[in-house]
Amino acid sequence: MKIPDNFLYYLSLHEDCNERLLARAGNLTPEELEVCIHPEIARIKRMVFAVLGEAHRMKAFVRLQPLGARVLYGFFKPRHKIEEHICDYFARRNAGIIVVLGNGSECWISLCLEGRIWRDHGSGMAITLEKLKTALHCSEDESSEDRSNVEGLWQVYYDSQYCPERKNLAAFKRHMPRRDQEAAGLRLVQNKENVTLDNFSSGE
């Protein structure tokens, strides 16, 4: 993994980042951070990579579900402070759709319109979704049906990816650690034979 030019941004999102580390890193170029072996600089590099890694995995792991036609939401409780970053990512990929990521205590809201991002930070997911459902006049039947269909498809996909019989299971677990599964609200089956998504969808 290469150190990005905006590595200070990712460093600032690390759970253990502070002003002193940011000031120290601010005197470095990406190239210097890449090759320097000083203990503190090496730590900064690890912190940047930790945030980049979690952000990369969460983009793949977070499951978005519809609330009517104008809202997508998903459970999200990461280790680092990447909530707004990931919410904006999904908003850009779903322009014109309100994206809500969060958990029982707080949530992040992003909307991309004409290339601009509008953001908000709310309380728990349930309260925020209820407010959106009321404001957008989403019917309970419509929301429940959409949610059920999407939950089923996502679970089928993730189940099909988790196969203990994989030849390189250790590598798979490194890329999909349990901590990240829980951060994205995933529930993976533990004892499935090596089958495809089509097999799961057809009930085989």
At which residue positions do the language-model features occur?
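Extended, well-ordered protein cores
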Residues: 1-204
